[in-house]
Every structure is written in structure tokens, then in C-alpha cells.
Amino acid sequence: MFKYKQVMIVRSDLKLSKGKLAVQVAHGAVTAAFKAYKEKPEWFKGWFNEGQKKVVVKAESERELFELKAEAEKLGIPNSLIRDAGLTEIPPGTITCLAIGPGPEEIVNKITGNLKLV
């Protein structure tokens, strides 16, 4: 059983290719993990040492990502909103992904527990 986890939430309305989705999730995972490393080092260390649990789920829209981000901020969970550079499939500045955590699983689940897996 894991004590910590990280969740990446991608926008289902963008219809990203599998490769594009993978890259956006990777950007989110790395950026949010680095933020946790600086802001919540005990959470980062626990998550890193127990195997770095990651889950990818989907949101319906950009608005939903902002709502989830606000919840994460309210609960003090490190997070990162990803904006695409626009070099391939979508316009520059398009918000594609929100990464939440790593953080305690029970807190992260309060924010993401009702979202569907990709």
C-alpha cells in the first residue's frame, strides 16, 4: 500500500494523440515533483522512496483543471499546470494537463478520487 501518490489530469476535450498526451503527462509529473521537492521535501522523499506512484486521469475541460488546481492550492498540495508550446498539434499556450502531488494519498484522493482513468 502506498502512502503517497501523484496524479496527472489531462483534458479529454483536446483529443490529443497518444504521444502528445504522454509528453504532457511527463511535463506535469516532472514539474510538480520538482515543486514538491522544494516545498514539501518530506512528501517528496516518502513518495520517491516508496516507488513514485503515479496515476493518469481525465477532466472534461480547461475550467475543470482550474477548479481542481484551486482545490489543490486550498489543501496545500504542490501542483503544476502545463501549457503547451504549440509546436505540433495544438495552439501555443493551450493548457493540457494539471499534475497534483506528490502528496499524501488520502489528501490527493479528496481532489482526484472521482475522476476516471485515461
UniProtKB/Swiss-Prot annotation:
EC number(s) stated in the UniProt entry for this protein: 3.1.1.29
Pfam families for the chain: PTH2 (PF01981)
An individual GO BP term: translation
Cellular-component GO terms for this entry: cytosol
GO molecular function: peptidyl-tRNA hydrolase activity
The keyword Hydrolase belongs to this UniProt entry's keyword annotation: yes
Keyword terms of this UniProt record: Cytoplasm, Hydrolase
Record's keyword annotation contains Hydrolase: yes
Subcellular location: Cytoplasm
Reactions catalysed, as given in the entry: an N-acyl-L-alpha-aminoacyl-tRNA + H2O = an N-acyl-L-amino acid + a tRNA + H(+)
Function: The natural substrate for this enzyme may be peptidyl-tRNAs which drop off the ribosome during protein synthesis.
Family membership: Belongs to the PTH2 family.
Name of this protein: Peptidyl-tRNA hydrolase
Gene for this chain: pth
